[in-house]
């Protein structure tokens, strides 16, 4: 195939043999039918042209030249090729459309990129009727022509060409932007035919005088004008620019006229009333106001106007900040109102529940109130559990531990097992109101008790302030808790524990208690003047203590450990299930867990069974109860066939009317590995067995652990397993 006219031939021989083709096409373009027939002959037999002998090629060239009447035109085809640039042919335009992924059909394209192609002439654009943007910059175009078919054109880019005159733009009635920068234009002309021309760029041309730009007065719609880097030097050009009603953007940089106009920016801003952008920066309203003030009164007026503008700007900023602060303040007020409403609702709901914290009527802090409520709940549940576990005793019996009221009214009596106290003496709980409180008898197995300790509180509606925690009362005198108000909840006895753990929940330091000797007992009293500084201490135990942690009282000198180094725990009760269904259902319970959290748990948390059987327990005064223990063992051996409960009621009495001492649990001689070790942690403190008969009251095999010599234990494996209830 023959090469395109715009593509240079490559190869030495091929270039010499086929050099006549450009001449053929050119003649065809210049001479219609004759050249067109010659071209068809060459196309039909290309091999003869390119492969044939040099004589045949020469004759063909002579024949073409004879037909065209130009005798020496093809004598030097390579030189002619170098003189002329690429042409804007239809085939080359189609190739460019394909290269830029445009439509092959010319009329469908609205944009055509013909920049940087080296074209020197605008031609063959008749079929591109739908063009809206035509890029022709950076070519060698010398004349604006052949644009009659581009009636829809909006943007025409002809910068960086060889144009010397503005012409042939009449068909472009919809042209909006025209770029003629970097050309050789000396006069602006022939633009009045463009009714909607908005942007004209004439930078880097040869405009010099006022007459060269005088035609701009006829461009009434021109808004953006770029005349930078020309040779304009006459200040009278401002009169031409003033006559342009819609001029908004003006660029005069690079012209000598800038140096010829005094106060150039102020002057241009004042004279061009609608100018918003001058040269390289905008014209702000403040700049225009200052320029107008300068035109009226000079620099002083300009300074005053500038200060006014600055004050207005500062005031505007201040107003904005104040508005934001007001919005924030209103939001905070609404938040405070919501919070106050919520607090008011909470206060109204708590008015009936709040109790004064002191005798003076001061309100109790929230933490103290919560502690007091938990302590009252604990004491109440303690007495309820005592009433459920202990039956009433017949009247007339004098219990060693009593709970009395100061009004002396009749009170029901009840008993608690001896396991509720650990190495402590009877505890007396007294109140001042007239309500009858249940009177409980708490037998003790420990040696003779020391004097009791009494803790008084001055507020009847709350727990006595300055209450000492149970951990500080190990082997201490009994605690007497007295109330002075009739609204006082029933209070119970708190077992004593070792002193090492600090009191939990204490918020302030307690005042030093005073020991007062009254009636042969030691009473701990608190200074009444500092009652408001006292605080009820929550009796909480974070750790679970076992019976193995009890101190060895008799071996204290041998071991060298003080009682303060031993960790004590609350007494625990283990109840062995009955042998048959004849046992008392009220006493047929498994075990009571250890007291872990006084404010929240019930009295059942006081008692628990230790899982550690590493140490052997023993009870002092074994010689005293040895006889009764042997008798109990004989009775059990004689009456093994008769099933009966293992726990005896504490209310049983001796016929003489005196309370019998509890027997010890005699173990077999053979040591037990499992049940024996587990039961060795406790020894029962219960009533003696009355008679040897089948209908004997239940016996007990529950005891309080004492650090002493190991004792023989019962063989608990001989009893059958308890039946499921």
From Swiss-Prot:
LRR repeats lie at residues 107-129, 130-151, 152-173, 174-195, 196-217, 221-242. One of its GO terms (biological process) is lung development. The keyword Phosphoprotein applies. Residues 1-91, 330-513, 632-703 are annotated as: Disordered. Mainly expressed in trachea and testis. The modification Phosphothreonine is found at residue 559. Keywords: Cell projection, Ciliopathy, Cilium, Cytoplasm, Cytoskeleton, Disease variant, Kartagener syndrome, Leucine-rich repeat, Phosphoprotein, Primary ciliary dyskinesia, Repeat. GO terms for molecular function: dynein complex binding. This is Dynein axonemal assembly factor 1. The gene is DNAAF1.
